[in-house]
């Protein structure tokens, strides 16, 4: 989803120097500093990007003669540029304003340092334009690991999340999980209306932060593991060794998925804690528990053969 110039002005408190056409969309998250273009080099120029002039580009223009500056700026603005932003609160060259006015282009200004401004606006645009989807489930932060709990309605996802919150972990969202793919990472958030709320069957909706404190909720979290609840089946083929990895594709990103069969008497919150701890262990170690068992078996067999 694109962002309009007007939205950008509002969110970054930009000063409007020259207005342009209304509802101009910004459809790419990259930013360009047009130093090479002002020098006359236009190979690989991306005019669809937001153009940002900082101290270096401004000084380059300042050193030009008025005629050369006019020529270079007219050439620059002949391309289909969405907007130009001047950083550091720098003064605007008159030739720049005249060239932009001819093309009816937006000229904006920010007081921020150029590198900091570019970093912030790039992150902002990447977030706004990221592919997005909504899944049914509960997203919690367990030991710093974002865990998406899925399963059919009424199977106990919210109740498990409540138990995890009581044990000191944090809730991101219940029931609806808004997910964005940003640079290969899946970031889950709560819809604004239900942020901080948890629905428990038989009780209704509870305000988690009011009952357990502000430290019990999070605005967003990167999804690392999917925990899928399903009803226990006596003849179910469940992974008992942890060697059969399963993944689920979300917005083109594969996420590890664990199937947890639910039946009375199982402490699901403890299982999820163990899954989070095991995930961290696997990231730090090249040896799995199965490898350790196999090594012990070989050592035991060698000892028996020597007897």
From Swiss-Prot:
Molecular function as annotated in GO: ATP binding; magnesium ion binding; phosphorelay sensor kinase activity; protein serine/threonine kinase activity; protein serine/threonine/tyrosine kinase activity
InterPro entries named among the record's database cross-references: HPr(Ser)_kin/Pase (IPR003755), Hpr_kin/Pase_C (IPR011104), Hpr_kin/Pase_Hpr_N (IPR011126), P-loop_NTPase (IPR027417), Ser_kin/Pase_Hpr-like_N_sf (IPR028979)
Residue positions binding ATP: 151-158
Keywords, ordered alphabetically: ATP-binding, Carbohydrate metabolism, Kinase, Magnesium, Metal-binding, Multifunctional enzyme, Nucleotide-binding, Serine/threonine-protein kinase, Transferase
UniProt catalytic activity: [HPr protein]-L-serine + ATP = [HPr protein]-O-phospho-L-serine + ADP + H(+); [HPr protein]-O-phospho-L-serine + phosphate + H(+) = [HPr protein]-L-serine + diphosphate
Necessary cofactors: Mg(2+)
Residues covered by region (Important for the catalytic mechanism of dephosphorylation): 261-266
Chain positions covered by the region annotation Important for the catalytic mechanism of both phosphorylation and dephosphorylation: 198-207
Protein EC: 2.7.11.-, 2.7.4.-
One BP term from GO: regulation of carbohydrate metabolic process
Gene3D superfamilies, per the entry: HprK N-terminal domain-like (3.40.1390.20), P-loop containing nucleotide triphosphate hydrolases (3.40.50.300)
Catalytic residues (positions): 136, 157, 175 (proton acceptor), 240
Broad enzyme group: transferase
Residue numbers binding Mg(2+): 158, 199
Domain of life the protein comes from: Bacteria
Purpose of the protein: Catalyzes the ATP- as well as the pyrophosphate-dependent phosphorylation of a specific serine residue in HPr, a phosphocarrier protein of the phosphoenolpyruvate-dependent sugar phosphotransferase system (PTS). HprK/P also catalyzes the pyrophosphate-producing, inorganic phosphate-dependent dephosphorylation (phosphorolysis) of seryl-phosphorylated HPr (P-Ser-HPr).
Subunit structure: Homohexamer.
Misc note: Both phosphorylation and phosphorolysis are carried out by the same active site and suggest a common mechanism for both reactions.
The record's note on its domains: The Walker A ATP-binding motif also binds Pi and PPi.
Protein name: HPr kinase/phosphorylase
Gene field: hprK
């Amino acid at each position: 989803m694109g962002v309009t110039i007007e939205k950008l002005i509002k969110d970054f408190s930009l000063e409007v120097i020259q207005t342009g056409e209304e509802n101009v969309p910004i459809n790419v998250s990259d930013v360009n500093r047009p130093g090479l273009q002002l020098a006359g080099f236009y190979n690989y120029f991306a005019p669809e990007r937001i153009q940002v002039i900082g101290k270096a580009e401004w000084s380059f223009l300042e050193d030009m003669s008025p005629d050369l500056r006019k020529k270079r700026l007219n050439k620059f603005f002949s391309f289909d540029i969405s907007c130009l932003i001047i950083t550091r609160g720098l003064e605007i060259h008159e030739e720049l304003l005249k060239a932009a006015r001819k093309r009816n282009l937006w000229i904006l200004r920010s007081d921020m340092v150029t590198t900091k401004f570019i970093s912030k606006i790039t992150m902002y645009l990447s977030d706004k334009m990221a592919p997005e989807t909504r899944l049914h489930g509960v997203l919690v932060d367990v030991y710093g690991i974002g865990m998406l709990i899925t399963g059919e309605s009424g199977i106990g996802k919210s109740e498990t999340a409540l138990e995890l919150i009581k044990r000191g972990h944090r809730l991101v969202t219940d029931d609806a999980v808004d997910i964005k793919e940003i640079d290969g990472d899946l970031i889950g958030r709560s819809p604004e209306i239900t942020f901080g709320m948890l629905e428990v069957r038989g009780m209704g909706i509870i305000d988690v932060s009011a009952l357990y404190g502000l430290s019990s909720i999070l605005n967003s979290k990167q999804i690392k593991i999917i925990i899928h609840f399903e009803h226990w089946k006596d003849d179910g083929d469940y992974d008992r060794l942890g060697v059969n990895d399963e993944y689920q594709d979300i917005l083109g990103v594969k996420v590890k998925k664990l199937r947890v069969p639910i039946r009375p008497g199982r402490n699901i919150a403890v299982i999820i804690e163990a899954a989070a701890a095991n995930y961290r262990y696997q990231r730090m170690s090249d040896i799995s528990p199965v490898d350790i068992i196999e090594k012990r078996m070989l050592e035991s067999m060698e000892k028996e053969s020597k007897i």
